[in-house]
Amino acid sequence: MKTLISNATLVDGTGADRRRADVLLDGPVIAAVVDAGTLSGTLSAAETGADRVIDATGLVLSPGFIDMHAHSDLQLLVNRDHYAKLSQGVTTELLGQDGLSYAPVDDATLAGVREKIAGWNDNPADFDWNWRTVGEYLDRLDRVEESNGEEDGGRIATNAAYLVPQGTVRAMVMGFAEGDPTPGQQQQMQDVIRAAMEEGAVGMSSGLTYTPGMYAQTEELAGLCRTVGELGGFYAPHHRSYGKGALAAYAEMIGLSRDTGCALHLSHATMNFAENKGRAGELLDLIDEALDQGVDITLDTYPYLPGATTLSAILPSWASSGGTEATLARLADPETRARIQEAVEVYGSDGCHGVVAEWGTLEISGVQNPALAGHVGKTVRDIAAETKQEPFDVFAQILTEDRLGTGILQHVGHEENVQAIMKHRTHTGGSDGLLVGAKPHPRAWGTFPRYLGHYSRDLGLLSLEETVHHLSGRPAARLKLHKRGLVREGYAADVVLFDPETIRDEATFENPRQAASGIQYVFVNGTAVIDGGNPTGARAGRALRRHRDGLTREGQQ
């Protein structure tokens, strides 16, 4: 099908000035990008060969947005309309984040990971987990099946690239317990990562405040990064602290990149908690110094103050060693429970970024156990006051009754830090959006319109052209996408049409599942998935694999 988009205000993703243009989509490809009126003013639809003409007067035409930190690994397959992302103009997502996802795995590792990140992605019992390798997972994305295992010929809603998750790899080789790898285990992890990248992963992620990935010392990570770098991939760490010692944690990651030659992409880069208020400039100075020395660094952020994670992440890492059953046993043992309380309330656990838990900042956003549903939307401190218990006792009780599956919002951010970092020359957008839970973080529905509406148009922090570049062309370059991420002839027809005067995020913390305003059309590989502001139900996304030439594109290697 050919679609002519006429009289659009083109913002092409390069950062160049906007211009008026006609753009012709021919199936999955952008066939023509010409001055406005060239196609629409002198030729009829029949003469251009267009099956449809969209008059885009007053609308901006941009590349589809690229979510550099997505947690849609399971939801792309389970809730296939994926309206949360399509409704905000996202056409490509980067999965496998924070060191924990579902490939590569063996049976035991998959069972442990499913339970561990149920608060991120849910854990459906009736779902067919019919892959074990990264290649098989990417094949599954390209061959979507219904829950009964029968193929329906559909596709996923967005395009998706994948990071091999370091914590999952470590669990497969070493289990979920603490400890340093033997030389043989180190080599085995590197071999697993090499295989994953040869099957299409674009890099490696870590979650260094999540077990078991956080048990890795710098030397262990360096070996893994060398393998990733040799294959032209990048390292995307959720590093060891966004609170106490945050700058040292960033410096460790930058040092890894410098020493191993592996490109670095800092996940949800920010400076949180009271001690880091107003300190974003120190982080940016650290990054700029490394960039000037030739270190390859990019980063992503979400444009909100609270973070989102699991309640179990607040535990000290030693308390989570060995997986769910071992953790629950420690919470049930009075002596060990007292040690956990001391770590959380007196010293500040490594899981809580070295900061003493502030119970009034930890808001329950989702639970696995329906009996706990009444806690959603309340902080641990609120629940303690209502039930006349101590906050730590509430914390431990919820973890136990929900088998560590509780999701939370963590209200610890600073607006001045968010604004400073989003203006940096390495910045890209990443929602870090969790799509499950009764009251998930609104960033899952609002990240990209919030950048364009609130921060660009309303506050003027970035020009429209700069903002679109941050959300499309720049992340496409980091991912080494082949002919994708710009509005240019011969590129993939992933495009968005939005009203620059009305685009805004509508999702709030009270009502988080609200579609954005102002996005009129979204095309994924040339197929309209949002049409006139409404979802079409079409799914046209593809798995995007790293190929042997170093570029990332659809299709087998």
Task: Please provide the spans of the model-predicted regions.
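Histidine-rich, glycine-flanked metal-binding segment
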Residues: M1-T3, L10-G64, N79, D505
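Divalent metal-coordination and catalytic microenvironments
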Residues: A8, P28, G58, H69, ...
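Acidic, glycine-enriched loop/beta-strand segments at the rims
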Residues: V11-D22, T406-V412, V418, L459, ...
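Alpha-helical scaffold segments that flank or form the walls of functional sites
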Residues: L74-L163, T182-E199, A222-E230
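Active-site neighborhoods of metal-dependent hydrolases
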Residues: Y137-L141, S147-V173, G179-P183, M189-Y210, ...
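Divalent metal-binding pocket/active-site signature
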Residues: A195-M253
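C-terminal cap of metal-dependent C-N hydrolases
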Residues: D333, A420-T426, S431-D432, V496-R542
